[in-house]
Amino acid sequence: MNGSRRGGGVDRTIRSLFDDAGVRGWLHVAELDRPSAHVVLDPDEQVPMGSVYKVPLMTAFCRLAEAGRIDPSHRLTLETADRVPGPTGLSILRDPVTMSLRDLVVQMMSVSDNTAAHAVLRAVGPEAVDRVCADLGLPHTRIHGGVVGTFDRLVADTGAGSLDAAMDRVADNDTVVPPDVYDPAYKASSTPADIARLL
């Protein structure tokens, strides 16, 4: 991979692909052993990070466990009322589930389980995740309550009565969506450069 220059051939090709798809895209790709060899498109722009927030959350959990500040075998019982919407994991179960924190982390990372991630975030605390981001040199990475914070904000920004209604509103091409819905300032967000550094 060659280091890119703004307006270079690779940049133009990727931007053209995004344009053809009718989307705006951001990118930061680098060789692991030679980070200066990279291709970037708006690498410092703040963007929603979706489930990628679970990576620094896992790192914060591991650091706290290693320091003896959290017991990875501590068991939590998650009632049906604790479920966070999502297509995988505990979100699709009907009965109370009891799991250790470390098993919740496995669920969170292996199937991107939103309910498990929310339970781990409550146990770890957002401040611990912020410290990890600072320690890893990720100055533009913010968690803002994880997926629950993002979903709550989506419902509020769309004026919908529920998450399902908010999702329907955002997915409807004939509905004008308030611009705050896509504002990374209030959601788990980062920059392509931070995310590449993290991964």
Regions found by a protein language model. Name each.
Residues 9, 56, 60, 100-103, ...:
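Extracytoplasmic/secreted proteins, especially bacterial periplasmic and envelope-associated proteins
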Residues 40-43, 100-104, 111-116, 175-183:
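Flexible glycine/proline-enriched surface loops and loop-helix/loop-strand junctions
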Residues 1-48:
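Beta-lactamase-like hydrolase cores
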Residues 48-72, 76, 195:
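Active-site SXXK
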Residues 83-120, 126:
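Conserved catalytic neighborhood of penicillin-recognizing serine enzymes
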Residues 22-24, 121-198:
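Mid-domain, small-residue-enriched loop/turn segments at the edges of structured enzyme/sensor domains
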